[in-house]
Amino acid sequence: MISRRLLATLFSLVLLFPAVRAASAARTAYVIIDAQTGFVLEQVDARDKRQVGSLTKVATAMVVLDWSEKRGGDLNQFATIPPEAFVGTGENLIGFQPGDRITLRDLLYAALVQSDNVAAYTLANQVGVALQPVVPTAGNGSPVAIFVGQMNFLAKSLRMERTRFVNPHGIDTGERSMPFSTAADLARLSRYAMNKPAFRFYVSQKERQISFERGQQKKAYMLRNTNELLGANGVDGVKTGKTARAGDCLILSAHREAEIQKQGEHTKVNPRNLIIVMLGSANRFTEGGQLLARGWQLYDQWAAGGRMIDPKKTL
């Protein structure tokens, strides 16, 4: 006959193993790269397809900024917030209402600084209308669908081969596997975005006051950045994300003073910048701080070894 002690031991093991599997399945996927070269300093599950929540808005912002830069789109033009922007978008902390009028510039601040979903949808709707005549594959698609198509076109151009966007804000959809990306793909996107001065400025703001019109009234709102690490230990961007399926997600950009090397009569300046992408973290800001410290340690070791770059380890 099995003793009570043995039964208790077996029961505890049954409880333990599922917990171990769950913890393993839910571990943070991350990548740490040198922002200058794209060299990967460390990665864990960086090619795993994950849902990424509001990190999606980095792609949303870049489609808008690229449209403005390449096609002369005016970021000071006003957009009218459509009723559809409130469907399934969750919180409305700014207090937008259908029919409110706001500039694209302030919508970008709202989407990037405070991660506002209504703002992201309105950007896609407004710029999608402008893209309809110039996108060959637009067909009869809605403005938002055309815009999301451009988000995926951008992803393809950046070799984000394991990414699929389905909306401009990253909210969970009815299909559990969509949208998705990877830590490595989002590092590629972040390198691209952080090379744009306008984007860098948006995501560097701890606070920003925006204004919008409601009929004859002018409303003001003070945005506060959702990135709690911004401004500490050289962190100068980028974006937070969180949904029920994505968990806590975070992209960090950080810098240190450039390293200056004398080489005979010449001087070489080595910028020191990191990008860290974390998906599915249990505590993104605590873990983000730890990975940042780890990243600089790895960077210093890599720099001391001559900054050798293996193309197979470069994004």
Regions found by a protein language model. Give the residues of each.
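Hydrophobic alpha-helical membrane context
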Residues: 16-17, 69, 299
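Penicillin-recognizing serine hydrolase domain
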Residues: 25-29, 99, 125-315
